[in-house]
Amino acid sequence: MNVTAAEAKKLQDAIKNATDPKGVGYRDFLKAHARSTHSVTPDEKRAPYTCADYLKAHLDPAHQGHGPVGHGYSSANLDAGTQYYAFRISDDVIGISLDTTDAGGHYEGSIGTAQLAWLEKTLKDNKDSYAVVFSHHTSKTMTNTRPDPARPGERRHDGAEVISVLASHGNVLAWVNGHIHKNVITPHKASGGRSFWEISTASHVDYPQLARVIELVDNKDGTLSVFTTLIESAAPHRTDFADLSQTGLAALYRELSYNAPGASKTLAGNADDRNTELVLKKG
């Protein structure tokens, strides 16, 4: 399919500016170019699935792998139609996983009132444990407050409101997220000397394709350290195009990401967004 620069810009602007959350413009775009498209053989393995299907798949013992069952999700999530949950990281650290996807459309996020209230309650109920919060979206990309079609009367809440809740609980150490495909570490201060770190990590799709290991350490001097170590793939830097093994394909994905036309070279972030020791006061 060949499109003009003007058509491509119009489509990209609609996506970026969230002016077409229902995809009407995209539908019209595809219709206008119907003659240059090709039919794809149907395959049930590519069939769209609902949130309920997604949860059921996680709860299916056939997909347990190394576990745990549900990988965080439970039958309670399936019954309530929710995709947020809490889990125990260690005896004195709880993990809280938020669902920041807005089903109302667009790629930016938010959370509903019920989830915000659940977050507040979960932090209060676990006030004697340190808390690490996880989500897909960053605080700055939670700007989409379109109503959830499944809960049309429920208000949506942005990143600033989530920060306000997290900052009001002294047991919150970090908010770990992604979405922006870039390594960024942001401090958040609150009254009473409270603070926490927002740790955003880049994507495996884009160069430099780094993962991050986060470790919590009690320094035994009234402080805690959060280490944010980035790790690199062990795949070769150069590709052997005849090698279709797991290692060979991993090498290919590294080479393709590095040579992607127009790819950003700033996604690794600055030095203070990568391998750091982030210190917090205990208490």
Language-model features and meaning:
Residues H179:
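Conserved active-site segments centered on acidic
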Residues N2-N126, N183-G283:
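Metal-dependent phosphoesterase/phosphodiesterase active-site architecture
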